[in-house]
Amino acid sequence: MLTSMSVLFTLGLATPFAHAADAVQMGAVLSLTGPNATVGEDVRRAVKLAEDKVNADGGVLGKPFKVIVEDSGGNPTTAINAARKLVSVDKVPVVIGEYSSGISIPMGQYLVKEGVVHINIASTSVKVRDLGSSSFNLIGLEDKGNKFSSQDAWDLGFRNVAILAPNNAYGQGVAHGFRAEFEKLGGKIVNETLYTAGQSTYRRELQQIARTKPDAYIYTAYGQESAVINREALELGLRDKPWYAILLSMSLSDTPANIAQGQLGMEVGSFVGPTGKAYADAFAAKYKEGMKTSYTGYAYDAVLMTAKAIDKAGSTDPAAVQAALKDVGKGYDGVTGKVAFDDGRQRIDPPYAKLKYDGGKVVPR
């Protein structure tokens, strides 16, 4: 009997998910290489954890479930090519990603044009709202984030601040939006500098904002370039004033702990309530460490919601899945809290958190 059971397992016949070719598939385009690779790998882990949970719970449509992950390389052309492969070769009904708004937006436009469902899990530009009828958004966008961060900065006692942000769709939205909200509160922006990404040094920009003698520096930056900015700010003596990061975990994802220590900031909420805690515990158990960024929970929710929508649709037809996802999105208990979409497929009341970097990690304050 033991021998025959061994044969069954060897042949892959002892499980209901014997043939990978029969898997129900969805896609993900993540930044696994390039300046945001740390975030991309963190999110990939969450995607795999979600895939494993779906399969442990019986799969989708009675079949195994698989998320095909492609690398954007942090480049919009590469991301669109990856999405094209997922659509034309793999025939997936849903693609999640990317990370940077400057990449997610053109990729989302392509997916909507092809009639494939796109789920935004990390990009915060308000332009995400305009992607079209098959695009869904799980995360808080800049307008809501700017209100939260400006009020938080005001409550911390900052009155005259300098802003440093990347010169792209995301950075422009943060800089201009924060200015508008902060000035409504009575605050003053003494300098606004938008930097070019990918430079080997940012000393010129840092010296420029330092000359205006702000109460605090408000900034946002992607992982590897942020590490350069934070190191050079320390070397130039700019850490004598508070540094406040919009999206703290992103801005510090590649910065050494001794340099990041003491920074303040805000973030999209990463996990909420008992469901969120169970997810965080499962993540730590599988990967022997906690999440490095706050975006993993959104990817996890997106994968589980997609699996639920495909089951509800009874089909992998993109139009059917889109309709089912709207229904799932009327009230889903996710790890990032309750997910409910408005008529424009945007999340209602997304979570935010007030944070600081202390003892080698991002913690609540």
Annotate each PLM feature.
Residues 5, 20-365:
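Extracytosolic ligand-binding ectodomains
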Residues 13-20:
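Sec/Tat signal peptide C-region and signal peptidase I cleavage site
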Residues 1-8:
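Sec-dependent N-terminal signal peptides
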